[in-house]
Amino acid sequence: MIDTIEKEDTIISEEEAAQYDRQIRLWGLDAQKRLRGSRVLLVGLRGLGAEVAKNLILAGVKGLTLLDHEQVTEESRRAQFLIPVDADGQNHAQASLERAQFLNPMVEVKADTEPVESKPDDFFFQFDAVCLTRCSRDLMVRVDQLCASRNIKVFCGDVYGYNGYMFSDLGQEYHYVEEKPKVVKGSNEANDGPEAKKPKIDPNETTMVKKTISFCSLKEALEVDWTTEKAKSSLKRIPADYFLLQVLLKFRTDKGRDPQPDSFAEDSQLLLQIRDDVLETMGLSSDLLPNTFVSYCFSEMSPVCAVVGGVLGQEIVKALSQRDAPHRNFFFFDGLKGSGVVDYFSSK
């Protein structure tokens, strides 16, 4: 697994150097080497999964496994550009494979049609990063805990109508490098004034700074104790999307599916009831998530998939290349407002 900045023994061929020339210029040869040595598991090949797959394949990871056991329907391919229009009834991963591989023949792209729930623990240990979409809360928590023991990076994400999120767990000690402007020492001449003696930033030179940051588990991030004074004082700045995520994950757990447009009336009432129950359990008022949320959280929307998939793909690339500061640990996107926010949640 790629777990330290020093591990850079992947060889980049001349053909690969030409293919990834722009990226090498952008984030450096060492970062591209780490990407080319990384294998990623992507679970869920709907609209969001397709966006993430595209971004990882174009970035140039070594291998990408597309895992999805469900069959293509007209509804499931509306936001999914990797699946042909005549693929109804086929498996999502298999139907996406040809177009995904065409994006970059240098990446090993595979399809896995088995349910992720049936996979043994050691299945996940062959990857450097695991990205989970359209998965239950229990499964995401299980995989996150498994991967933490092997320093495997875990990402989760979903799109619900106008809203979407991503979560990342990069471990207790995640190391990365960040490019900073170089600071030039001031003058030491006795006759120079105070301004000349002050250190200055040279805009033409940069230096690479090594940094370390810690992440909490998904379980800890979802189990914040909102009854504490510290948590209560922060409620005003907490995005409602965090509580929307809790409601939608509970809906998925209870119903085994996401809210469906063809059962809008029934699912809307159930969402409101789950909202009341979830927030009451947290010791919070249902006013934190107004009733109008039910009008905007059905199905995947292509533009929202593009935004969230772009951010999620970018964060996976950053984590594998160990270049630049990562989002810690949630990113929420609100399509109605056209805005995204990064926030950190932990029960500790």
UniProtKB/Swiss-Prot annotation:
The protein's matches in InterPro entries, at most eight in alphabetical order, are given as: ThiF/MoeB/HesA (IPR045886), ThiF_NAD_FAD-bd (IPR000594), Ubiquitin-activating_enz (IPR035985), UBQ/SUMO-activ_enz_E1-like (IPR000011)
What GO cellular-component annotations does this UniProt entry give? cytoplasm; SUMO activating enzyme complex
One Gene Ontology term of the biological-process aspect is: protein sumoylation
Location(s), subcellular: Nucleus
Main localization of the protein? nucleus
Keywords assigned: Ligase, Nucleus, Ubl conjugation pathway
Return any one Pfam family short name: ThiF
| Annotated function | The heterodimer acts as an E1 ligase for sumo1, sumo2, and sumo3. It mediates ATP-dependent activation of sumo proteins followed by formation of a thioester bond between a sumo protein and a conserved active site cysteine residue on uba2/sae2.
Q: Subunit structure, per the record?
A: Heterodimer of sae1 and uba2/sae2. The heterodimer corresponds to the two domains that are encoded on a single polypeptide chain in ubiquitin-activating enzyme E1. Interacts with ube2i.
Name of the protein in question: SUMO-activating enzyme subunit 1
Give the source species. Answer: Danio rerio
Q: Which gene encodes it?
A: sae1
